[in-house]
């Protein structure tokens, strides 16, 4: 699948997901290439159809995009609930376990998700896998002592790599932390790994989102299809 085909599937999933946002809602808006299409469609509906809703974003770049359409964006602490959060995912399996954080927004994404009544992910079909872990698992760590955390990960066989930008500088999250990507190839026991990571001093959050999502909208060549989590 080339990039144009992949983008077409992402766009279709984003347009389908935008239908979930209705007048008067408070909607969490995620981060990433698929969410960009979602925000474009919500912006179109706001400007052309008069859709009025309040957004809570998981990154500053999504906030800038949404506000460019005139969408009202507020801080998460200025709302008492979030009706639905729509976000992308880097991988998702049949048990609705996912990896997120390829865009370095995993902490804000998880905070918004855990305060939402409903969580929806939008992905293209390449992101649906049998076992998560092929995509590197992002872990957000504070800069102080990050090298020590990386050494611990190396000792555990996690194959950590500090994420750098095109200029060779450390990628910084919106909270000014570092991102360490774990090249695990496959994750057979995600819950155990999640507990190990979050209990490591210096780790702020990890990109494992386990059985959190209610619905996954998959961009498919035959049209968007919906995976519904029966355990939620």
Curated annotation (Swiss-Prot):
It is an enzyme of class 5 (isomerase). GO terms for molecular function: ribose-5-phosphate isomerase activity. It comes from the Bacteria. PANTHER family: RIBOSE-5-PHOSPHATE ISOMERASE. Gene3D superfamilies: 3.30.70.260, 3.40.50.1360. GO terms for biological process: D-ribose metabolic process; pentose-phosphate shunt, non-oxidative branch. The active site is at residue 109. One of its GO terms (cellular component) is cytosol. Pfam families: Rib_5-P_isom_A. Keywords: Isomerase. Belongs to the ribose 5-phosphate isomerase family. Pathway: Carbohydrate degradation; pentose phosphate pathway; D-ribose 5-phosphate from D-ribulose 5-phosphate (non-oxidative stage): step 1/1. It comes from Bifidobacterium longum (strain DJO10A). This is Ribose-5-phosphate isomerase A. CDD domains: RPI_A. Catalyzes the reversible conversion of ribose-5-phosphate to ribulose 5-phosphate. Its EC number is 5.3.1.6. Coiled coil: none annotated. Substrate binds at residues 31-34, 87-90, 100-103, 127. It catalyses: aldehydo-D-ribose 5-phosphate = D-ribulose 5-phosphate.
């Amino acid at each position: 699948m080339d990039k144009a085909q992949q983008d077409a599937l992402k766009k279709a999933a984003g347009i389908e997901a935008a239908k979930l946002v209705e007048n008067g809602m408070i909607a969490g808006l995620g981060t990433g290439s698929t969410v960009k299409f979602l925000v474009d469609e919500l912006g179109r509906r706001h400007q052309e159809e008069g859709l009025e809703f309040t957004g809570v974003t998981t990154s500053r770049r999504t906030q800038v995009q949404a506000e460019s359409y005139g969408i009202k964006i507020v801080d998460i602490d200025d709302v008492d609930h979030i009706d639905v959060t729509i976000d992308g995912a880097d991988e998702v399996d049949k048990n609705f376990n996912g990896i997120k954080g390829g865009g370095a927004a995993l902490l804000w994404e998880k905070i918004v998700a855990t305060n939402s009544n409903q969580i929806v992910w939008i992905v293209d079909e390449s992101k649906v896998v049998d076992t998560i872990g092929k995509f590197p698992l992002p872990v957000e760590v504070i800069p102080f002592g990050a090298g020590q955390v990386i050494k611990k990960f190396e000792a555990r066989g996690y194959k950590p790599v500090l994420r750098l930008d095109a200029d060779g500088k450390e990628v910084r999250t919106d909270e000014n932390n570092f991102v360490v990507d774990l090249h695990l190839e496959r994750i057979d026991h995600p819950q155990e790994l999640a507990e190990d990571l979050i209990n490591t001093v210096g780790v702020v959050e990890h990109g494992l989102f386990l059985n959190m999502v209610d619905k996954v909208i998959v961009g498919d060549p035959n049209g968007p299809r919906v995976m519904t989590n029966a355990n939620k």
